[in-house]
Amino acid sequence: VTGDKTFTPAPVEIAACPVEEAGIHPSADGTSVTFALYDLDTDNNYKDYACLIGDFNDWELSTEYQMKRDNDKHFWWYTVTGIDPAKEYGFQYYMGSEKDGNVRIGDPYCEKVLDGSNDKYLVEQGVYPASAIQYPNGKTTGIVSVFQTKPASYNWQVSDFKIDNPDNMVIYELLFRDFTQVGSELATGTIKEATKHLDYIKSLGVNAIELMPIQEFDGNNSWGYNPCYYFAMDKAYGTKEEYKQFIDECHKQGIAVLLDVVYNHATGSHPFAKLYWNSKESKTAKNNPWFNVDAPHPFSVFHDFNHESPLVREFVKRNLKFLLEEYKFDGFRFDLTKGFTQNKSNESTASNKDDSRIVILKDYYKTVNTTNPNAVMILEHFCNLDEESELAKAGMKLWHNMNES
């Protein structure tokens, strides 16, 4: 139901969680799935209870789907059985708190979401298939996560692509929407349409495409610097399979594909933001273990990640590894890395050498390099030369010599 009807939770059952990582974990045969959600704030408190709601229980709150608590891993967890491996299911976590109020959130590690406010336009214009799972209108509110325990696997035609010379890339920055869209017709600014023009891009002497942010962002019409779900690619441009087909086709033509990633901040739609949220101030709450209430630097928008938090570091590194392995991206352009710091600064001091920021970026680069030694990591940094030189010596590349010509 869309409203928060009266629900009396059962006493919380304390039990060891059978999985080691937060997220969605299908069984080997695909007939069951274990969900695990991290919940522990900076005051060492957690919500009063958590329930699963979704297509598997017709979105009804019930003690049958009340999640168990593992206080060692700080997880809420539950195993749902009777799953059809060939079917997509929508679901949310319903988090109950007498102190903070109740909230419905998706899973931060899900690979697809449904948006009741925006998906209908994608269906109407043929960008997202009408035959695919749709938003459960009238049964819940907010963004819905999707899982399938046995999805069809993509058959990569090129599985071993490598950048010939990472120091000699001619990069074409591409926004799917603007590259081919005609007027307001969403169906003309898609992955499918862009794929048709790869010959043109190659004719320019380009050997790498840098996709502007495509991880799930608020709305349908955006440059993508307002991310909310990092493991889900935005449906505004096409399906997961179409994203992979685009990358595969680029690799066939000798073109690397880099992804512009936005880890400085996220919108209030992100599950980590919603879990500990100050509704009076429209900001992340002081006890949120992932976000700062206010950015310590002067360049932030939306809600600023605390990159000193082990939780944030783990999340970012897990996401980088996922993108390299699942989509075979050849590297990344990191947006606004100057903001990866907890040291307070102003416009005059933000570019000064920051040793803690260097440590953070080296940590992320290690994950990239370990996962794919050929992958590149380009920083939009614009800090003092002593800091940029140290990052460059570590193997990272930096925007430099910028001009307006």
Regions found by a protein language model. Name each.
Residues 110, 114, 153, 157-166, ...:
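Substrate-binding/active-site clefts of carbohydrate-active enzymes
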Residues 7-45, 134-136:
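Non-catalytic, glycine-rich low-complexity segments
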